[in-house]
Structures are given as C-alpha cells and as structure tokens.
C-alpha cells in the first residue's frame, strides 16, 4: 500500500506542475484574471451594488428581476440565439407577450478577441413558446417600425443579451423614450470578461449620462457577467 501512496504522490506532483506550467502561458486565463480584478474594483466602488442581492446563476437573477416588475408594458429580449432565456421568461409570464429581437445571422461584428463575426449564427429559428414573438433582423432595421407602433407603450422588462456595444447602443437609442421609471433591465454581459468596459456596460452608462437616468441595482451573478437594475427616474427626455 505504501508503494501506491508514493506513486500517487509523484503523480499528483507531476500533474500539479503540469497545470501550473500550462497556466503560466495561458493568455485567456490571464486576461480573465485582469477582467475579474477590474470587475471587483467596480463593484467595490459601487457601494449600492455590493449591497444588492447576489445570485448563483443567471436564471435566478432573471426570475427575481421579473418578480420586481411593477408597470404594465413591453417585455423585450435582445439577443435570442437558441431561445433558452426567452422561453424561461415566457414560462414565468405566461399571460404576457414577449418580443425577441435577433438577426439569427450571428454577431454583426467581432466581439472581443475570440468571438468572430457570424458567431452564434443559426440555420433555423429556435422553437419558442406560444407567447413569444420573434422579430428577425438587425436591430437598426427592425426597431424603427416597432417603436413607431409602440411609441406610447413603456418598457416594463428589458433583457439585453446582444453582447456588443454597437448593438446595445442601438437598443438604447431607439427605446430611450419607452424606458421609464420602473423599467427593469437585465444585462447578460455587463462585466467580468475581457473588454467589458467597452461593451454593454459602456452603452448603458452613455444612456445614463445622455438622458440623466437614475437607477438602483437589483443584483448580480457572483461568478458570471449578469447584472440587473431598475430605472427610478429619467430627467433628460
């Protein structure tokens, strides 16, 4: 039995050294550590965020955020992909119509350093619940007509899962008059990845500055990228 323990010890030491050697040259892990550090700094500086609710996964965050809806209005998701999250939302709100926007042609431009243009393209539309309406096309092509039709309807719940700064910017540009006090917004890629400061995060804070938006944090996922908040006031519209 002693020989087996010695053998296992040698094996574990060899394995640990191999992992350490691989990690020492792993650029992706190094970039993620930098992203985690900057994310933690942001959370520490945002005193109210650190005091908000913490969730184990994005579905817990989505469920809680939906429970905080207080106004009647549009339920919208931007970035549907295979429909996992929009179906989850639809199941929680079976009596509401959910609008899902996506080109289904993949990313319109490269995102970060490892998600190239066309990533997430689907050959067929995803299967969605009966209370889901899919709006196919680029946001800048589909939103003008949609907003014209719903110009007087507020957004009650907004799920931003479009990854890119440009796409998120387009959403806020077109929906800024529909976003009101009480609107709940959940971001799927807000922080905690390399380059997060130039993505959904940046587009949101530009909207906050442009429209003089006040908001409160609802919570975030402890080991992922998701964040939820509630608009409490808009002065600049």
Segments from the language model and where they lie:
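Membrane-proximal basic amphipathic "stem/tether" segments
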Residues: 1-50
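S-adenosylmethionine/decaboxylated-SAM
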Residues: 37-49, 63, 68-237
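Short, intrinsically disordered low-complexity segments
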Residues: 1-4, 8, 57, 95, ...
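Conserved SAM-binding loop and adjacent beta-strand
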Residues: 48-60
């Amino acid at each position: 039995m002693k020989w087996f323990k010695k053998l296992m010890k040698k094996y574990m030491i060899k394995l640990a050294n191999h992992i350490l050697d691989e990690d020492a040259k792993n650029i992706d892990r190094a970039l993620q550590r930098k992203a985690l550090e900057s994310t933690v700094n942001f959370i520490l500086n945002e005193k109210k965020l650190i005091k908000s609710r913490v969730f184990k996964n994005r579905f817990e965050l989505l469920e809680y955020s939906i429970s905080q809806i207080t106004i009647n209005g549009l339920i919208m998701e931007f970035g549907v992909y295979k429909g996992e999250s929009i179906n989850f939302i639809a199941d929680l709100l079976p009596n509401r119509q959910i609008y899902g926007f996506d080109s289904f042609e993949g990313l319109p431009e490269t995102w970060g350093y490892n998600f190239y243009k066309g990533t997430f393209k689907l050959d067929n539309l995803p299967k969605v619940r009966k209370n889901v309406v899919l709006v196919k096309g680029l946001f800048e092509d589909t939103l003008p007509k949609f907003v014209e039709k719903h110009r007087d309807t507020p957004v009650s719940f907004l799920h931003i899962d479009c990854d890119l700064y440009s796409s998120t910017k387009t959403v806020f540009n077109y929906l800024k008059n529909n976003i009101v006090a009480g609107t709940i917004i959940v971001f799927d890629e807000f922080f905690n990845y390399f380059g997060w400061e130039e993505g959904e995060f940046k587009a949101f804070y530009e909207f906050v500055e442009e429209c003089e938006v006040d908001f409160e944090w609802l919570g975030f996922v402890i080991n992922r990228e998701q964040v939820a908040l509630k608009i409490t006031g808009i002065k600049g519209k």
